[in-house]
Amino acid sequence: MGSQGSVSFTDVTVDFTQEEWEQLDPSQRILYMDVMLENYSNLLSVEVWKADGQVERDPRDLQRQVGSLTTIKNQPPTEERGSRFGKTLTLNTDFVSLRQVPYKYDLYEKTLKYNSDLLSSRNCVRKKGDGCGGFGEPLLYLKQEKPHAGLEYSEYNGNGRALSHKDAIFKHRKIKSLVQPFVCNYCDKTFSFKSLLVSHKRIHTGEKPYECDVCQKTFSHKANLIKHQRIHTGEKPFECPECGKAFTHQSNLIVHQRAHMEKKPYGCSECGKTFAQKFELTTHQRIHTGERPYECNECAKTFFKKSNLIIHQKIHTGEKRYECSECGKSFIQNSQLIIHRRTHTGEKPYECTECGKTFSQRSTLRLHLRIRTGEKPYECAECGKAFSRKSRLSVHQRVHMA
């Protein structure tokens, strides 16, 4: 980008004559000050700041440019006026005077040290007066016997926290008039709406007011309950546009879509199979290592996956929460109910590409394909005989055990 000419405060200043100024009503004068402060803030934000928080330029130059923004409540205009503005701003408010600073400009040492103790200090008090520049929000003044003059009033927001040097006071006043912050009394986090604060506080209190009417599991947020209930209803609103596969949660769809994008960065060192997520690789590697870290405390049966253990434990508890609305038969898993429903509807979504035969279950299609291909993946460790089905291998192994 080519070099741009430097912009001074004069370039963005609008001057009035004394007669013109006196014809402005209070709201117009406030607007004028807002615009001037905005321009001033924008110029400051692009300055080169030193490590100690000072601006690299002659402070007296700023004094000449900014002039005077004095606000004296219920008093006639002061005779002192800045050389650039051409008049003194007199507003019927409680703004701190910018002109009270000594000529040598303590401003840079005290007020605009944005990384100084001024920013970290929270020793401030809300001062009620005519409000925040006519917008109805009181400003925060530093709680000191002799408050610093200058821009201190723009340094704090409604949470007692310092605004950055890029935040002009005009933004603070207008935003504060629209958004009242709600502060968490546990962690000081702030929110735009009270409902968000109420919801957030449940993290600290542990409150879970939303209960599933099917399994009585409770949740702190209604959105989480809605997501959970999809397990019971079988609803899968998130569909892959590539293959049509549907998912209960959007996060699962995002993971699935990586398969289409061929982003599987996690590879198995044993067989070379790749996975989209690291936990999938970790689970897969247990096939090679034989590790089964999840054990049933009822029968001591072990499992590769925790989800398989949870499903298995329902056999012991007798829990069957998924009921068929057609015949009343209940099932441990929702997937079992979906398959069962096909007996009523006659749906057979899985088709053999070789012969066109259809099946209600994917597993049945796989078995059918093995018959056609002659594949026998289940091999006996004793004699080497292979089978197309695992159940037939189990029956065969009894011969060796006899």
UniProtKB/Swiss-Prot annotation:
The keyword Phosphoprotein does not apply. Signal peptide: none annotated. Keywords: DNA-binding, Isopeptide bond, Metal-binding, Nucleus, Repeat, Transcription, Transcription regulation, Ubl conjugation, Zinc, Zinc-finger. GO terms for biological process: regulation of DNA-templated transcription. Residues 169-402 are annotated as: Does not affect nuclear localization pattern. The keyword Transmembrane helix does not apply. May be involved in transcriptional regulation. PANTHER family: RIKEN CDNA 6720489N17 GENE-RELATED (PTHR23234:SF10), ZNF44 PROTEIN (PTHR23234). This is Zinc finger protein 1. It comes from Mus musculus. The gene is Zfp1.
